Regions:
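Glycine/small-residue-rich loop that forms an oxyanion/phosphate-binding "nest" at active or ligand-binding sites
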Residues: 78, 89, 98
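Hydrophobic alpha-helical transmembrane segments
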Residues: 1-73, 89-91, 102-103, 108-249
């Protein structure tokens, strides 16, 4: 039931038709976020693999990025936009939280999204298609695990009734943390050559950097922070894969 709640929460696929999930389970959705990465990463990688057979790789990468956007309903991208607007335009904790809750997109959010997807597209088009697919499957799950550690290291910055999702995530138990780690690391261990495993360090470092920023300026996290952290961790993973690839070849 917890996995189903996570699939319902983090995607726009009709998993809600399977069963009616009680609200209490949505407090644990982050526990299974890396498992959801298997699905969303699989959709993105599968789209790239198939479309690259009959389309130029530049277009295939665009199709792959669009496929995951449709699968997730741009949930994480919404977080990235609000994060950029809040931290870019906010001068105090309260101002940052107020801007992040505003549904309108600002200049910082637009620029952040443009730079993010421009760089992502550039990075993925320079990789071979098999490596790009393996990196996507690996990076999605591992970056979700890294981003999930926000709930274990920071308090929630708002009151529960002020949350967009109307839920505050529970922290992971040691057993759940181990399960999430295995779910995040397994695709990378199975699909990428050992020389690329060094890329796993980049999302961990990105998480530490962002967590420190949130602790200093927000004294906590929000749901938008989780989405932004995932995307930025994933970006750092692909960038490192690209650096290793270009040096090897």
């Amino acid at each position: 039931m917890k996995l189903l709640a996570s699939l319902i929460f983090f995607t726009r696929l009709p998993f809600w038709k399977i069963a009616d999930v009680p609200p209490v389970y949505f407090k644990r959705v982050v526990d299974y976020w890396p498992f959801v990465g298997w699905l969303t990463g699989g959709i993105m990688a599968g789209t790239l693999w198939i479309t690259a057979e009959f389309l130029p790789v530049q277009i295939a990468v665009l199709m792959a990025l669009a496929a995951r956007l449709l699968a997730t309903g741009a949930l994480h991208e919404d977080g990235l936009v609000d994060f950029c607007d809040g931290f870019g335009g906010g001068t105090s904790r309260d101002k940052i939280l107020s801007i992040m809750k505003d549904s309108h997109i600002g200049t910082y959010g637009v620029l952040g999204l443009l730079f993010y997807y421009g760089l992502m597209w550039n990075i993925l088009t320079t990789l071979s298609v098999p490596l790009a697919c393996a990196a996507i499957l690996s990076g999605d799950a591992w970056s979700k695990f890294c981003a999930a550690q926000i709930i274990n290291t920071l308090p929630y910055a708002r009151k529960e009734e002020e949350s967009k999702a109307k839920v505050i995530y529970d922290r992971m138990s040691p057993g759940v943390l181990l399960s999430a780690f295995m779910a995040g690391a397994l695709p990378m261990l199975l699909l990428l050559d050992k020389g690329y495993w060094w890329a796993a360090i980049a999302p961990a470092m990105m998480f530490i950097l962002l967590m420190s920023l949130m602790r200093r300026r927000l004294q906590g996290y929000t749901g938008d922070c989780c989405g932004a952290t995932f995307l930025l961790c994933e970006f750092s993973f692909y960038l490192t894969i690209n650096l290793i690839y270009t040096n090897l070849w």
